[in-house]
Amino acid sequence: MAEEIRFVSGQMPSLLYATKQIVAASAITRAIHRHERFTEMLYVYQGAGQYIAGGYSYPIRTGDILLYNQGDLHEVTSSLQHEIGTLCFGISGLQLCGLPEGHFTKAENGFVRPAMDEIDHMQSLSELIYEHAERRTSYSDEIVAQLLPALVLLSANLPPDARAADQPHNLVLANRIRQYIGTHFTEQLTLEDIGEAMSMSPYHLAHIFKEITGMSPIHYM
């Protein structure tokens, strides 16, 4: 039986924001980004796409929970013409036993959890939190404060599936290189700059990136 994940004693997370992505909207390209002072979790209520977090790439579908560790680069893209339907929650003060502050999971356990038998609970909790966060009344704030810890613990304790299996090292590195370029696109980057940031030699970096993407980092930029 897997070890249960619990909060550090006396440490309860707080909701910073709740947003709902409407499926009817046309799919848009979002900038790769990270959050240095808080974390996020998303519930996919409709659609399919891809989630990349910390360089690890996962196909995602309805009923998935997307976990994010504070400080990691991440992005969600739809595989259809329309936006993937998600409920997104920004969370501060997350402290789970055995994990660094702001971390939902260890990378080797993957960043996606299928809701499976808990899908009805996940849907209901996510919708309730979003709706009450939108109301912004004192009693709604209290409801959110009570429901959010339940959603977080339920999500963190869901078992990973086969998508959490080891991913090719070079694929993870190529994703991290691409994400680094994406967050520094306004700068005049050189291979040496990227190599220094990734702790890799420029030659090795360029070789891996071309092997995975079919183009050099310079052409990608």
Predicted segments, located by residue:
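Amphipathic alpha-helical segments enriched in hydrophobic/aromatic residues interleaved with Lys/Arg
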Residues: 102-162
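Ligand-binding loop in jelly-roll beta-barrel domains
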Residues: 71-95
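Generic protein-terminus/edge-of-domain signal
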Residues: 1-65, 72, 80, 103-105, ...
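Short, Lys/Arg-enriched anionic-surface-contact patches
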Residues: 164-172, 216-221
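Cytosolic nucleotide-utilizing catalytic cores of signal-transduction proteins
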Residues: 139-142, 167-174, 186-187
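Basic/polar phosphate-binding segments, predominantly the helix-turn-helix DNA-binding elements
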Residues: 176, 180-182, 187-221
